């Protein structure tokens, strides 16, 4: 088989980078594939912390497989085409490892596809190492642990699967770190928003979902102080409005998540605010509302929006 590119979604978070990096190593060493990990964007500050901590070089960024002379790819941490490579419809998808809903996805040929309702794609990749009796290098264990911590907010998110606790313990042992101490350091690294412009802030961790003909952008930022983020509301709303016009989104929903108290403030703009309000049974005041206990876009925001939009 010719060269295969392995990558996570656009605007990659820690799980996207970690799972793709680890899967590329697995593909080369267990499946004997000519696999290269790449990324669909630069690592965010949280991911950069993990990469630096474990001495791993960030994957190079690509936009097109064809431009790389590659026609076969493997996706991790996503499957929806609008979240993937620009020419994803023109290449062969050899495999997918994911933990999200399956939507807006089809292939011309059969493929290897593993989708599980667990806390992270990294959790699945780690299990695949064990199934193939492949030793997990320390730095890869550290990255996989980071992906799991990031996606589950240190195992506090409702997306956390009962098996994720054991996975986290095993990976922490392999990586040589204290789970709680390293976990908090990692999460705090991702809350430094002061250096970000508003345009950067709303794009740190953002995904587009096609909901009944509407392109709904759902972004999330982590913080230890929601009020501090809302001090920038006017400028954030300007950035959101610009993105709506430029990218053609019908709606933009920003989750401002307090990682300490496990709550979120929802800031939303667009043409379907009635559906956003109905999704969460709240009333937007000055374009935002409090959503207690909400920390997961995948489980506590997207399904509710999907139902409300009738998608």
From Swiss-Prot:
Q: How is the cofactor bound?
A: Binds 2 manganese ions per subunit.
- State the organism of origin: Streptococcus uberis (strain ATCC BAA-854 / 0140J)
A Pfam family name for this chain? DHHA2
Q: Which HAMAP family match?
A: PPase_C (MF_00207)
Family annotation (InterPro entries): DDH_dom, DHH_sf, DHHA2, DHHA2_dom_sf, Mn-dep_inorganic_PyrPase, Oligoribo/pAp-PDE_c-di-AMP_PDE
Write down what this protein is called: Probable manganese-dependent inorganic pyrophosphatase
Q: Which UniProt keywords apply?
A: Cytoplasm, Hydrolase, Manganese, Metal-binding
MF terms in GO: inorganic diphosphate phosphatase activity; manganese ion binding
Query: What top-level branch of life does the organism fall under?
Result: Bacteria
Catalyses: diphosphate + H2O = 2 phosphate + H(+)
